[in-house]
Amino acid sequence: MDEIVDFSYDAVHDIDPGSNHIAIEPGEQLTMEECLNAILIRSANEVSFAVAEHISGTTWQDFAPIMNERAKELGCVDSNFVNPNGLPNEDHYTSAYDLAMIGRAFFANEALCKMTMTHMLHILPSERQPDDIMEVNKMELIPGGKYAYPYLVGCKTGYTDVARSTLVSCAEKDGMKLICVVMKDENPNYYEDTIALFDYGFSNFQRAVSYTHLRAHETPEHLV
């Protein structure tokens, strides 16, 4: 989390005009933790590009193959990524199932979940960047939000004119954790739809142990 991420000219200026950003300038630096907070709370596109360059070691474009390989490892079957920020491209696509697979890995990380529940992004000025950056988390499912959901573990929104509103979220109640994916929805409907789906799941699903890994002649120990 403390590693330093450099912002190149391309990372700052390759983002689409009018897309979300936090006004970082070329040559400035943030820690990885600051970058992740900016991506999760503000959907900062130049930060996504800088992190992609940092991880790939070259260009943000070279990060896409890494994303695709990791997606396959997580069980994704209907996705192809060509950029690190999810803005529209005919060759960039995913599905609700695949977002749930990615979400399952994401929500297993407590530090990332905590970031999504933070009410305010605050990056203090430093020798690496001069600005006092403050952005309010507009997510309405978190505590204090208009649609605050008491069992929420974490969440991430997305929006483009093409895809409309997307919300991937996780909630836990009575030891059961559910992941909800809502796509091509509208704000604020996607909050209401997410809550309705979680409430349905918690009312109608229950935890069960899968024995599919056992051979035909084997019996679970607790049944012997």
Positions of PLM-derived features:
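Active-site-adjacent loops and short helices of periplasmic peptidoglycan-processing enzymes
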Residues: 1-97, 106-107
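Domain-terminus/edge residues, biased toward the C-terminal soluble/receptor-binding domains
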Residues: 76-80, 88-93, 97-215, 220, ...
